[in-house]
From Swiss-Prot:
Organism: Mycolicibacterium smegmatis (strain ATCC 700084 / mc(2)155) (Mycobacterium smegmatis)
UniProt EC number: 4.3.3.6
Regions that span the bilayer: none
Gene name for this UniProt entry: pdxS
Assembly mode: In the presence of PdxT, forms a dodecamer of heterodimers.
One of the GO biological process terms: amino acid metabolic process
Molecular-function annotations in GO: pyridoxal 5'-phosphate synthase (glutamine hydrolysing) activity
Residues engaged in binding D-ribose 5-phosphate: 33, 162, 223, 244-245
Higher taxonomy: Bacteria, Bacillati, Actinomycetota, Actinomycetes, Mycobacteriales
Protein name as it appears in the record: Pyridoxal 5'-phosphate synthase subunit PdxS
Binding residues annotated for D-glyceraldehyde 3-phosphate, in chain numbering: 174
Active site per database record: 90 (schiff-base intermediate with d-ribose 5-phosphate)
Length: 303
C-alpha cells in the first residue's frame, strides 16, 4: 500500500507517506467548519490550522433534514481563495465522483463524511486512487482500521455532529484508545483473533499493537462547543480537534474560536483554560444525544 495509486484525471501521485505527512502537519490544531469566506477568515485569524468548507453546518443539516450532498464548487472555491490555510471539503460516503470533483477543485483534504447522506451503504470510497488525502470518521478501532486500509490519511473519532453534546465524542475516543491498549498486551497468536474481530488486516493490527497508536493522525469531532470540551478531548488522546456548529452557532464566534484554539494548545494547563473560558457569551443551545433516536444519529453511518 506504500505505492501510490493514480487518479484518472491526474498524472500526479500521492503516497501514503506523503498523505499522512500532510495530516501530521495539522497535529495539535483546530479545524473549523465554515460556510462563507468571511467565516473562513475569522477562523484563520483565530488560529485554525484548516477550515472545512460546507454549505450548512451539521446543526442546520440535522434541523433541516432532507438529502445532504457535496457543497457547490463555487462556494468551495470562494473559501479556498479567502484563506491561506488548508481547506477541506466533504464528500458523501461512497460517492467517489464527488471526491473526484473536490480533488479537481484543489481542496487540500477530502472528508468522506457521515454528516452528509451516504451515497453507498455497502462500499466506502477507494481512497488509494486519489492524490488528495482523505479524512474519515470512526466510532471504534475496527472502523478506524478499515478506513486506513481503504487509504484514509487521518481518522477523526465521530462523536455526534451538530449537537453541542460532547458525550459521544468522549465515548468514541475512549473506545478507540481502550481497544489500542488492549492490542498492546496481546501475543501474536491473539492478534490473529483480534484482526478477525476487528475485520482488519493482520499486518495493520500488528503495527498498531507494536506502536501503541494508529499509523495515521487521530483527531476528534462531534459536539465540541467549549474550550473545556476541546481540552478534555486532547487529554483523552486526541491529536487535534474538529469544531463544527459550536463556533458559528454561539454568541461570540470570534472570541470562542480563539479560545478553543488556545485550549487545544494548552489543554493540560487549568489556569489557561480558566482564563480563556471567561466571557465567551452563550454557547450553542444544542441537543442532548440521548434524545436523538438511534436511526437519526449521524455517527451510525459508516461501517
Amino acid at each position: 500500500m506504500e505505492t501510490a495509486a493514480q487518479n484518472g484525471s491526474s498524472n500526479q501521485t500521492g503516497t501514503a507517506r506523503v498523505k499522512r505527512g500532510m495530516a501530521e502537519m495539522l497535529k495539535g490544531g483546530v479545524i473549523m467548519d465554515v460556510v462563507t469566506p468571511e467565516q473562513a477568515r475569522i477562523a484563520e485569524a483565530a488560529g485554525a490550522v484548516a477550515v472545512m468548507a460546507l454549505e450548512r453546518v451539521p446543526a442546520d443539516i440535522r434541523a433541516q433534514g432532507g438529502v445532504s450532498r457535496m457543497s457547490d464548487p463555487d462556494m468551495i472555491e470562494g473559501i479556498i481563495d479567502a484563506v491561506t490555510i488548508p481547506v477541506m471539503a466533504k464528500a458523501r460516503i461512497g460517492h467517489f465522483v464527488e471526491a473526484q470533483i473536490l480533488q479537481s477543485l484543489g481542496v487540500d483534504y477530502v472528508d468522506e463524511s457521515e454528516v452528509l447522506t451516504p451515497a453507498d451503504y455497502t462500499n466506502h470510497i477507494d481512497k488509494w486512487k486519489f492524490t488528495v488525502p482523505f479524512v474519515c470518521g470512526a466510532t471504534n478501532l475496527g472502523e478506524a482500521l478499515r478506513r486506513i486500509t481503504e487509504g484514509a490519511a487521518m481518522i477523526r473519532s465521530k462523536g455526534e455532529a451538530g449537537t453541542g453534546d460532547v458525550s459521544n465524542a468522549t465515548t468514541h475516543m475512549r473506545k478507540i484508545g481502550g481497544e489500542i491498549r488492549r492490542l498492546t498486551s496481546m501475543s501474536e497468536d491473539e492478534l490473529y483473533v483480534a484482526a478477525k474481530e476487528l475485520q482488519a488486516p493482520y499486518e495493520l493490527v500488528v503495527e498498531v499493537a507494536r506502536a501503541g497508536k494508529l499509523p495515521v493522525t487521530l483527531f476528534t469531532a462531534g459536539g465540541i462547543a467549549t474550550p473545556a470540551d476541546a481540552a478534555m478531548m486532547m487529554q483523552l488522546g486526541a491529536e487535534g480537534v474538529f469544531v463544527g456548529s459550536g463556533i458559528f452557532k454561539s454568541g461570540n464566534p470570534e472570541q470562542r474560536a480563539a479560545a478553543i484554539v488556545k485550549a487545544t494548545t494548552f489543554y493540560d494547563d487549568p489556569d489557561v483554560l480558566a482564563k480563556v473560558s471567561r466571557g465567551l457569551g452563550e454557547a450553542m443551545v444544542g441537543i442532548n444525544v440521548e434524545e436523538i433516536a438511534q436511526p437519526h444519529r449521524l455517527a451510525e453511518r459508516g461501517w
